[in-house]
């Protein structure tokens, strides 16, 4: 569940915070009436967070443990600014204002053609920073449609829309032409699904096809879940502070593997 409102239409900080309090209360009441478990509520700053920088309105409000800070990290994608450590450090500082809630960048990305430019490392750098600062992420979209409002002016300007997403789309027929394998290849990688204790580090070495993650403050007997983007053999896993690696589920060409903690500190390495 995502809730957001733009300060540029008149909300000041206190009003924005009050909005999120009301939104969270309404969501939790709906869940109670539906006999549903509490879902994660994503809350955002202004969609002009990139442009406004430190002047952005960052909501700070009373919440439960099921909230996630979700700014759109579009620097060097579609917005000005530099995509660097300072951006992600700022994100963590803003999350700390709400008690250190987890962070998920609700949107990020850029034109898919940049993924095939050998001189352009935008996608690799963004994912590297996500790992370094342990930020989850969702890209803008899976497949764009010709009728997307973002392209409303294109017919009048006589330009073909530059469609985002994993699929080439013909406009105006809106027919899928094909899958962008080169684009997908830059984004195809392992992802931690559940980590015991606290995640200490994540590193996806895409050049050498090696994934490493470590954690601390775990309790013995806790389960780690790791999604792998291709089939592996158990011999490709190196575990420290973990035991009993097992294939939990196959998802298309990918797999979810588990392991059980034996110590407070753990490390998992996968070589492809």
Predicted regions, residues:
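Short, solvent-exposed turn/loop segments enriched in Gly/Ser/Thr/Pro and often Arg
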Residues: 1, 45-48, 140-147
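Aromatic-rich peripheral "rim/lid" segments of glycoside hydrolase catalytic domains that contact
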Residues: 58-63, 70, 115-241, 249-272
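Extracellular glycoside hydrolase catalytic/binding regions
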Residues: 2-135
């Amino acid at each position: 569940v995502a809730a957001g409102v733009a300060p540029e239409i008149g909300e000041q900080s206190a009003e924005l915070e009050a909005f999120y309090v009301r939104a969270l209360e309404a969501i939790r009441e709906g869940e109670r009436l539906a006999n549903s478990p509490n879902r994660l509520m994503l809350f955002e700053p202004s969609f002009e967070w990139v442009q406004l920088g430190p002047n952005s309105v960052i909501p700070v409000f009373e919440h439960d443990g099921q909230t996630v800070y979700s700014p759109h990290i579009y620097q060097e994608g579609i917005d000005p600014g530099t995509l660097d450590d300072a951006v992600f450090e700022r994100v963590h500082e803003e999350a700390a204002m709400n008690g250190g809630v987890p962070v998920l960048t609700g949107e990020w990305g850029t034109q898919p053609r940049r993924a095939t430019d050998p001189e352009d490392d935008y996608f690799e750098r963004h994912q590297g920073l996500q790992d370094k600062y342990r930020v989850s992420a969702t890209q803008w979209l899976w497949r764009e449609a010709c009728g997307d409002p973002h392209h409303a002016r294109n017919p009048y300007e006589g330009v073909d829309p530059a469609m985002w997403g994993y699929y080439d789309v013909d406009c105006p027929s809106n027919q899928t032409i094909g899958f962008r394998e080169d684009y997908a290849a830059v984004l195809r990688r392992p992802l931690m699904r559940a980590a015991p204790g606290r995640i200490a580090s994540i590193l996806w070495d895409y050049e050498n096809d090696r994934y490493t993650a470590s954690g601390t403050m775990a309790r013995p007997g806790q389960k780690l879940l790791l999604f792998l983007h291709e089939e592996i053999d158990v011999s490709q896993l190196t575990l420290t502070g973990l035991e009993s690696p097992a294939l939990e589920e196959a998802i298309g060409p990918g797999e979810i593997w588990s392991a059980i903690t034996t110590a407070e500190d753990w490390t998992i390495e996968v070589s492809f």
